[in-house]
Amino acid sequence: MPPDASATREKLLDAAARAFAEEGVFNASLIEITRRAGQRNRSALNYHFGSREGVLCAVLERHVEFLARREGELLEIATRAPDDDVASVVEAIVRPAAELAQSGWRGRSCLVIIAELAGEDPATYSPELQAVMSRTGGYAVYSLLATRMADVGHDVGNERFALITTFVLRSVADRARLLDRRGRRGRPQLDHETFVRNLVAMASAAMSAPRP
């Protein structure tokens, strides 16, 4: 890819990441994304990515390798824990997200985007988006979590997975934003490790609660 084309692609990805995180994956205007990227040609985004889901997949691809590696490492530890240990599995969701949030606004945007997608029916994903989401390693984590969480039935279990994913990812992203604004009347924040452990404890308690 020529240098100019590569630079344009990166600008489009940055603009899309911000827009998807701020306005929603399905609400963000593709024309506005193109404008934010400084492109006069309205078809630039379609030229580089083909569609909304094409650019969405490309935005997520930036972080897939990191998430897959860290979740895989922590999942390996969790598999050696007792069969009723929920916290070690939940940590494989929380800790990689917290580490990604520390990498900068691109990582935080990715977390907000994934949190939104967690509320959607995976059956509606395109094959390309399904493939990207599966490569994050999250599906393997949730498969193990399903064997250790409280027996609440398929319907409540799926609801908890979606709610906890959204809760964890948005909590992590929001904390990172507050730290960026430190000194602007934001409330005091826990140190990183205490925050991670507290979030793991909260999410584990929710996943272990009996069926209502």
Spans of features found by a protein language model:
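Basic, helix-initiating cap at the start of DNA-binding domains
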Residues: M1-E23, E32, G54
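An amphipathic alpha-helix adjacent to DNA-recognition modules
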Residues: R9-D14, F49-G72, E76
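Amphipathic alpha-helical packing segments from all-alpha helical-bundle domains
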Residues: R106-V112, E120-M149
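Hydrophobic alpha-helical connector segments
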Residues: G72-C110, F161
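Short alpha-helical scaffolding segments that buttress acidic/His motifs in well-ordered protein cores
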Residues: I93, A97, L111-A118, I164-V168, ...
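Short alpha-helix boundary/capping elements
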Residues: N41, E53, W105, A118-Y125, ...
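C-terminal peripheral helix-coil segments that are non-catalytic and often amphipathic
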Residues: R135-P212
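Helix-turn-helix
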Residues: A19, F26-G54, A58
